[in-house]
From Swiss-Prot:
It catalyses: GTP + H2O = GDP + phosphate + H(+). Belongs to the GTP-binding SRP family. FtsY subfamily. Part of the signal recognition particle protein translocation system, which is composed of SRP and FtsY. SRP is a ribonucleoprotein composed of Ffh and a 4.5S RNA molecule. Residues 1-22 are annotated as: Disordered. Its main location: membrane. One of its GO terms (molecular function) is GTPase activity. It is an enzyme of class 3 (hydrolase). GO terms for biological process: SRP-dependent cotranslational protein targeting to membrane. This is Signal recognition particle receptor FtsY. It comes from Neisseria meningitidis serogroup C. Residues 1-10 have a biased composition (Basic residues).
Amino acid sequence: MFSFFRRKKKQETPAPEEAQIQETVAKVESEVAQIVENIKEDAESLAESVKGQVESAVETVSGAVEQVKETVAEMLSEAEEAAEKAAEQVEAAKEAVAETVGEAVGQVQEAVATTEEHKLGWAARLKQGLTKSRDKMAKSLAGVFGGGQIDEDLYEELETVLITSDMDMEATEYLMKDVRDRVSLKGLKDGNELRGALKEALYDLIKPLEKPLVLPETKEPFVIMLAGINGAGKTTSIGKLAKYFQAQGKSVLLAAGDTFRAAAREQLQAWGERNNVTVISQTTGDSAAVCFDAVQAAKARGIDIVLADTAGRLPTQLHLMEEIKKVKRVLQKAMPDAPHEIIVVLDANIGQNAVNQVKAFDDALGLTGLIVTKLDGTAKGGILAALASDRPVPVRYIGVGEGIDDLRPFDARAFVDALLD
């Protein structure tokens, strides 16, 4: 019996190989468990990391969204402010434009009113300036226009009045024929109706002289050469012309070409200072050289107008007439088409002798215009009629006073009205 139990106990004891296997299995199970544990830990760590990254990404995206929202909100706010400012600027611009237009309209209206006042002022000065001529003619014509029938005796009286007013024979004959034709055409009978006929006849005669000087639009200087006898008023006329052109927005330069008289140079320099205009002069040298230098200076400085004075001379002084021809030639060398205007200044006091002067200077230089001065100091207003009939060179300007504004473009209608009204 004891032996039976001993055998059984011997059978339950594992064999060495089996024990080794079990040990290996246990070891493997332990390692597997460890691996599983490690994997589990790694998985949990990875999950935590991914979760953190996801949460960070979500947070970043949320922040970006908020930033975009804020940026968009700021942009919208700025856009609204810009729109409001733009609207305010548009309104301000509208108001400014309206104000500017209003001011411009006011300035235009003021300029028109000033122009009308100026016209009236000039008409009054012209009428006052022609007082001596008008009074003489009015006194002489009183008997003609005083009534009575129009007959040959009346025509003879009218003819005498015209001749004594320095309307030479040619002009007088033209006017008498024109008046007779108007009387016949209109069936005029009474002597007081002759005034209207004479006014229209005189206007038609001198109207061709009314050709105002028109300055071309050019970048080159416009050169005006002035000539005449001593005492005609050349230098004074140049000073007044400078002021006149300045009022038109033109820049002016003066050439003191009267080198024979120191007083003429000083007088022109005084006008230059008065008008704030540059004067080109030389203490020595001839007139042509001064005028040449003046044109060169004007070209270099971009001046609009050059007014070139020359020495006074009588048409009978042949050597001086040759000298003034030289001035013209030298000006042509300074500028190929200069002088653009050649003007003779006439003293109205010399009466019909003015026609001879115009003919002489015209033959020598080829005149383009006249300035008739001192009409306020003479009773010889008929000089323009004589010029119109004998040598109709355009009368650019007339002077009826000592004032700086008393030199103005010739207006035939205004002249006739001032002379005969």
